[in-house]
Curated annotation (Swiss-Prot):
Topology with respect to the bilayer: Peripheral membrane protein
Tree of life domain: Bacteria
UniProt organism field: Albidiferax ferrireducens (strain ATCC BAA-621 / DSM 15236 / T118)
Name of this protein: ATP synthase epsilon chain
Cell inner membrane listed as a keyword: yes
Keywords recorded for this protein, A-Z: ATP synthesis, Cell inner membrane, Cell membrane, CF(1), Hydrogen ion transport, Ion transport, Membrane, Transport
SUPFAM superfamilies per record: Epsilon subunit of F1F0-ATP synthase C-terminal domain (SSF46604), Epsilon subunit of F1F0-ATP synthase N-terminal domain (SSF51344)
Compartment(s): Cell inner membrane
Keyword Membrane: yes
GO terms for MF: ATP binding; proton-transporting ATP synthase activity, rotational mechanism
Known role: Produces ATP from ADP in the presence of a proton gradient across the membrane.
Signal peptide residues on this chain, from the entry's feature table: none
One Pfam family this sequence matches: ATP-synt_DE
C-alpha cells in the first residue's frame, strides 16, 4: 500500500505522527489534498481542520490555527503555533472565545486592537467549523 509519513506539530507537542494514504488541509489560497509521491511544496496554511486518512483507513482530525506546510514525496510536515486533536476540541470554550473576540472588536481603540480581535475571531470561527466537521465524521 502506498503511504506518506505525516507529522503535525504544535509549539507545545507533536500532535500526530504516522503513515497516511491522504491528507487534506486548508491552504492559504484553497483546500490542499496530498497523496504519496506529491510534488515538493512549501505553503502557508490558514486556520481550519487537517484531515488525515491513516494507512488503516481510519481518519484523524486536527484543528490548526494556521502555520506552515512542507510536502516532500514521502513526507508531510505541518507546523502550527496551535494544533488541537479533533477529539479534544471544546465547543463551549470556542464559543466563549468567539464572543470575547466579538466584544474586543466592538471595544477596539486602535487599529492594532481591531486587527488582533479580528484575527482571533477568524481562528475561533474556524475552530468551531472544524469541530462541527469532526462531529459529522464520527
Amino acid at each position: 500500500m502506498n503511504t506518506i509519513h505525516v507529522d503535525v506539530v504544535s509549539a507545545e507537542e507533536s500532535i500526530f505522527s504516522g503513515e497516511a494514504r491522504f491528507v487534506a488541509l486548508p491552504g492559504e489560497v484553497g483546500e490542499l489534498g496530498i497523496y504519496p509521491r506529491h510534488t515538493p511544496l512549501i505553503s502557508r496554511i490558514k486556520a481550519g481542520s487537517v484531515r488525515i486518512e491513516k494507512a488503516d483507513g481510519s481518519e484523524e482530525f486536527v484543528f490548526v490555527a494556521g502555520g506552515l506546510l512542507e510536502v516532500q514525496p514521502n513526507c508531510v510536515t505541518v507546523l502550527s503555533d496551535t494544533a488541537i486533536r479533533g477529539k479534544d476540541l471544546d465547543e463551549e470554550k470556542a464559543n466563549a472565545a468567539k464572543l470575547a473576540a466579538e466584544e474586543a472588536m466592538k471595544n477596539a481603540k486602535t487599529d492594532i486592537d481591531l486587527a488582533r480581535a479580528t484575527s482571533e475571531l477568524a481562528v475561533m470561527a474556524a475552530q468551531i467549523a472544524a469541530l462541527r466537521k469532526y462531529r459529522q465524521k464520527k
